[in-house]
């Protein structure tokens, strides 16, 4: 017989996001991944800034605390979110988690694409995310893989990300220290 547990000390969430590339270049010459601007010759098709890494983290964090998905909270049909920085969505998701008494313990993020090359930007991404979420960088793992030229990603038509977030129950529902947006 399965018994109900009132307060689960740890919770796990899984997130996924995918966006296609447009044939046109981005207006400012870069795309944004995990809050970091990366020079790239193609624009990401998206309603917001198209940051697939951050979108996957938002989805994982919302799922972790039973708050649905990024599309429920920030629908791409709502003009308020047009060109919005995805860091706003992540801070909102973190706020919802903290309001329920959960803090992010660690996360693992995989970005899937052929181009742009992600590995050179990972240290900057980890630093940005650690400052944004008020976490130690050692609790953050960001990596990149390709699809070995298979499928739409392999043909260079898009980019995807998978995220796993582990949260722990905390005694006080207060913001993590340093959880201001480092982009200003």
Swiss-Prot record:
Record-listed 4-CDP-2-C-methyl-D-erythritol 2-phosphate binding positions: 17-19, 47-48, 74-78, 152, 155
Catalytic activities: 4-CDP-2-C-methyl-D-erythritol 2-phosphate = 2-C-methyl-D-erythritol 2,4-cyclic diphosphate + CMP
Cofactor(s) required for function per UniProt: a divalent metal cation
Top-level taxon in the UniProt lineage: Bacteria
Keyword terms of this UniProt record: Isoprene biosynthesis, Lyase, Metal-binding
PROSITE patterns assigned: ISPF (PS01350)
MF term (GO), any: metal ion binding
Annotated protein name in UniProt: 2-C-methyl-D-erythritol 2,4-cyclodiphosphate synthase
């Amino acid at each position: 017989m399965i018994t109900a547990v009132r307060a689960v000390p740890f919770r796990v969430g899984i997130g996924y996001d995918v966006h296609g590339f447009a044939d046109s270049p981005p207006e400012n010459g870069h795309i944004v991944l995990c809050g970091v601007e990366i020079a790239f010759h193609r624009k990401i098709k998206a309603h917001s800034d198209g940051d697939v890494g951050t979108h996957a983290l938002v989805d994982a964090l919302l799922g972790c605390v039973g708050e649905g998905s990024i599309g429920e909270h920030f629908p791409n049909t709502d003009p308020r979110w047009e060109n919005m920085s995805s860091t706003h969505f992540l801070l909102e998701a973190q706020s919802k988690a903290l309001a329920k008494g959960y803090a992010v313990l660690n996360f693992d993020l995989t970005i899937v694409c052929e181009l742009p090359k992600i590995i050179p930007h990972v240290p900057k991404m980890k630093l940005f995310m650690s400052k944004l979420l008020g976490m130690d960088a050692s609790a953050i793992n960001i990596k990149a893989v390709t699809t070995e030229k298979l499928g739409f990603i392999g043909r260079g038509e898009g980019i995807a990300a998978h995220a796993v977030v582990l949260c722990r129950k905390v005694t006080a529902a207060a913001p993590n220290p340093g959880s201001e947006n480092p982009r200003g």
